[in-house]
Amino acid sequence: MADETKPTRKGSPPIKVYCLPDERRAIEEKAAAAGMSLSAYLLAVGQGYKITGVVDYEHVRELARINGDLGRLGGLLKLWLTDDPRTARFGDATILALLAKIEEKQDELGKVMMGVVRPRAEP
């Protein structure tokens, strides 16, 4: 039998696409958001694959910070609920402020989560 080799992408002719500079910039931004090269992004989109973006590391870091804050606030609330002697000096105003702070952190967490999800869901 003859020695047959499989064709590779590098050995195949490229497909040229004409676009305006702002269109190219938009495509490059979407490829970068997906963590892909421009070529890999266009190949995947052209074949109908659903592109999933890479979560922004700043959002992840912020979510971790808020989660830690909620854990600390929850620990304080737990101490108060168990009538721990260390929390005997806490008055009702302090506990209400703690509950308000927990609610504020939960709202902040929701906003950051929407910031992660919303850009990926909209075109």
Curated annotation (Swiss-Prot):
Q: How does it assemble?
A: Monomer.
* Compartments (UniProt record): Cytoplasm
Gene Ontology molecular function: DNA binding
Task: Determine the domain of life of the protein's source.
Answer: Bacteria
Q: What does this protein do?
A: Transfer of plasmid RP4 during bacterial conjugation requires the plasmid-encoded TraJ protein, which binds to a 19-base pair invert sequence repetition within the transfer origin. TraJ protein is bound to only one side of the DNA helix. This nucleoprotein structure is the initial complex in the pathway to assemble a functional relaxosome.
> Which keywords describe this protein according to UniProt?
Conjugation, Cytoplasm, DNA-binding, Plasmid
Q: Which residues form a coiled coil?
A: none
Among Pfam families, the record links this protein to: NikA-like
* Name used for this protein in its record: Protein TraJ
Give yes or no: UniProt keyword DNA-binding. yes
Gene Ontology CC entries for this record: cytoplasm
Q: Does the keyword Cytoplasm apply?
A: yes
